[in-house]
Amino acid sequence: RDEAVAALGFERAYADYRELLADPDVDVVSICSPNFLHHEIALAAIAAGKPFWIEKPMGVSAAQSREIAEAAEAAGLITAVGFNYRHTPAIERARQLIRDGRIGRVTNVRCWLIADYGSSPEGPLTWRHSRDKGGSGVIGDLLSHGADLVQYLAGRIEAVTATSAQFIPERPIPTKAGIGHTGWEVSDELGAVENEDWVAVLAR
């Protein structure tokens, strides 16, 4: 830990998130753990009175996400979900043009989100592919960005029809964990993927 602090230039590091939340010098928290830890850490941050930025999806289920949102609101805390694409200059400019009436009535928005980190069947079976630990697959990981952007630009979605599929049903089981999407070592043994890796949505 001391080596990481020195190498990365941080003032301090913590071995446990509870230690961080107990520090009175910490003003705001970024919750960027794997999905299955979001709920636990967010509720602890709320109990500690710490405002937070939380990665999406907020929880592995709608019930978990709702509980976090309601608890934060009851505590009067400022929070944000990690929909970072809405703050890119192009999106902010498009939103302003729409608000100013410069492009007329918006009748159609098309949004594609493609990520290659899950495209290879040789990629490792990680927590992202587990219903218990990852929750939804591409719906929570990528579609959530699309749904946020569409509503940020054009208003609330009122009706949805959708279909999803799983194109890679099995993946190699890791023998050594990596960080993020890289650095994983895998075995020849395969494990089942539990969530979807493709989804298409038509929304009004």
Positions of predicted regions on the chain:
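N-terminal Rossmann-like NAD(P) cofactor-binding module of classical short-chain dehydrogenase/reductase
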Residues: 21, 27-30
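Short, well-ordered coil/turn residues at beta-beta hairpins
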Residues: 32-33, 153, 195
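NAD(P)-binding Rossmann-fold cofactor-contacting core
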Residues: 1-6
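Beta-strand-loop-alpha-helix segment that lines the small-molecule cofactor/substrate pocket
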Residues: 28, 34-86, 101
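Short, Asp-centered acidic motifs that coordinate Mg2+ and/or phosphate
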Residues: 12, 27-28, 108
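Active-site beta-strand termini and strand-to-loop segments that position acidic
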Residues: 196, 201-204
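Predominantly a Rossmann-like dinucleotide-binding segment in NAD(P)-dependent oxidoreductases
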Residues: 85-192
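Conserved SAM-binding strand-loop segment of SAM-dependent methyltransferases
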Residues: 10-17
